[in-house]
């Protein structure tokens, strides 16, 4: 996967501005180009036209203002970062226009929040629908970029999504520290205790599961990268959501790369772990939206 073409969907909010600047950092690092896209909602435009029938120039004025604002944003990004940036204004249904534009990009980049809490409820719904339907990786930017990504966390569950998420992490970052993490549990541990299996035997069983997971992580890393020393591995017992958020804090992660964790119904659902991380993490989250095979 290349990162030659990055699409930023912007609503002119501060968070969308952070997303645009993160895209510029990635574009400058990878030699790519970014496009800023603003979608004017067709229903909103129709309502404006109906409301101001006596002012036929209102629609044209709005369109011109949006184009000028977006063009200036692209020019500022190019001047500040050196990244090639262009802009485009579309009119239509927001979700459909973004999805259509993303088909010609290598990655879709979004800000985490909108301008205000009420609007954010709507944007949040749009973002989740995008994650369900988009065929490109989706980067959700949560804070202003501070240079290149330096500490990347990749949670894995050994599903087919794990390898593609790890591959994605290596392509997005050039010199970052990458930590691959897995949370495990002990099957039937409670029943083993009820069956009077000794604590020592259960602990031995737990250690075996942990070692097996470590072996799988190292095999996974070797399948996508030649240099094992570029990666760290973490295998701990517990809930994956808690482990991911704890490791984010401990490692000072500035990016989490995670799969959508779907299966046959992945077009209808975003996995609960992925949704939880998107909601509760402090750092940026890159979601691999590819289908499991």
List each model region and its residues.
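Structural alpha-helical scaffold elements that stabilize or flank donor/cofactor-binding regions
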Residues: 6, 100-101, 145, 152, ...
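Glycine-rich, Arg-bearing micro-motifs that act as flexible, cationic patches
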Residues: 110-129, 148-149, 255-280, 290
């Amino acid at each position: 996967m290349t990162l030659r073409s990055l699409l930023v969907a912007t609503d002119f909010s501060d968070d969308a501005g952070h997303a645009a600047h993160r895209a510029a950092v990635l574009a400058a690092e990878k030699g790519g180009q970014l496009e800023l896209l603003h979608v004017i909602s067709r229903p909103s435009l129709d309502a404006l036209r109906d409301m101001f029938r006596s002012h036929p120039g209102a629609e044209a004025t709005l369109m011109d203002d949006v184009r000028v604002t977006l063009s200036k944003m692209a020019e500022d990004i190019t001047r500040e970062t050196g990244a090639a940036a262009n802009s485009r204004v579309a009119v239509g249904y927001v979700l459909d226009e973004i999805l259509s534009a993303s088909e010609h990009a290598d990655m879709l980049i979004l800000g985490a929040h909108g301008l205000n809490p009420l609007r954010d409820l709507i944007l949040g719904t749009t973002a989740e629908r995008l994650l369900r339907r988009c065929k490109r990786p989706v980067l959700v930017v949560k804070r202003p970029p501070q240079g290149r990504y330096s500490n990347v966390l990749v949670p894995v569950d050994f599903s087919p999504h794990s390898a593609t998420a790890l591959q994605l992490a290596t392509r997005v970052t050039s010199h970052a520290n990458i930590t691959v993490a897995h949370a495990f549990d002990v099957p039937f541990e409670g029943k083993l205790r009820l069956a009077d299996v000794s604590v020592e035997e259960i602990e031995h069983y737990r250690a075996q599961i942990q070692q097996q997971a470590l072996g799988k992580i190292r095999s996974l890393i070797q399948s996508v990268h030649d240099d094992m020393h570029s990666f760290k591995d973490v295998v701990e017992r517990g809930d994956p959501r808690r482990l991911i958020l704890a490791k984010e804090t401990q490692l000072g992660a500035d990016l989490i790369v995670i799969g959508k964790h779907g299966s046959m119904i992945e077009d209808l659902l975003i996995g609960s772990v992925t949704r939880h991380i998107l909601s509760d993490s402090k750092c940026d989250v890159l979601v691999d939206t590819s289908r499991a095979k």
